[in-house]
Amino acid sequence: MDRIVSSSHDRTSLLSTHKVLRNTYFLLSLTLAFSAITATASTVLMLPSPGLILTLVGMYGLMFLTYKTANKPTGIISAFAFTGFLGYILGPILNTYLSAGMGDVIAMALGGTALVFFCCSAYVLTTRKDMSFLGGMLMAGIVVVLIGMVANIFLQLPALHLAISAVFILISSGAILFETSNIIHGGETNYIRATVSLYVSLYNIFVSLLSILGFASRD
């Protein structure tokens, strides 16, 4: 009897996990599309950058709001507000590359981001490997990157900036592996939180690839 109950529970848990994964990918596709629209509008209208302080307040404020409302219907609205804002602040960055004739760099960064996401997701979904061991390493990597970013505010070293971008790509790729594994193993049951986590990883990979490829093109 216990085996029957256990087997039934496992199947229910697996179906629930798959549902979270499907909902996550669906919402992720919608937020990416919305972010692309706001980024395009920001680029075409040549909207100015909101500045460092407003960017940080808007980004972390909306992220906090999204996580706070993740279990409510308003969480979806918060997720779109967050991703839309990041799309808006991406516009001035894209204009910098377009004005320098680096449209091909943007295309390569998009392609590279899609490839990284596909490979990381496919690996976890195929192997179903538990990636929870990455948690500590990812946190340590984030701390190192933050220290490097603060240091480079004063040092202004191009080599350090490139190194930070490269590490950001590695950390974000690891975060995709970690979050996808967390979803399929039932560690993350909220698709809104999962969506935001994957979106931020994709955003960081794209911006970091832009930085690296743009630097290489200038040389």
Swiss-Prot record:
Name by which UniProt lists this protein: Modulator of FtsH protease YccA
GO molecular function: calcium channel activity
Topological domains, Extracellular: 44-46, 95-104, 154-157, 217-219
Functional summary from the UniProt entry: Negatively modulates the activity of the FtsH protease for membrane substrates. Overexpression or stabilizing YccA counteracts the FtsH-mediated degradation of SecY when the SecYEG preprotein translocator is jammed.
Post-translational modifications reported in the UniProt record: YccA is processively degraded by FtsH; degradation initiates via the approximately 20 residue N-terminal tail in a sequence non-specific manner. The deletion mutant yccA11 is resistant to FtsH-mediated degradation, probably because it is too short to be degraded by FtsH.
Listed transmembrane segments: 23-43, 47-64, 74-94, 105-125, 133-153, 158-178, 196-216
GO terms of biological process kind: negative regulation of apoptotic process; regulation of proteolysis
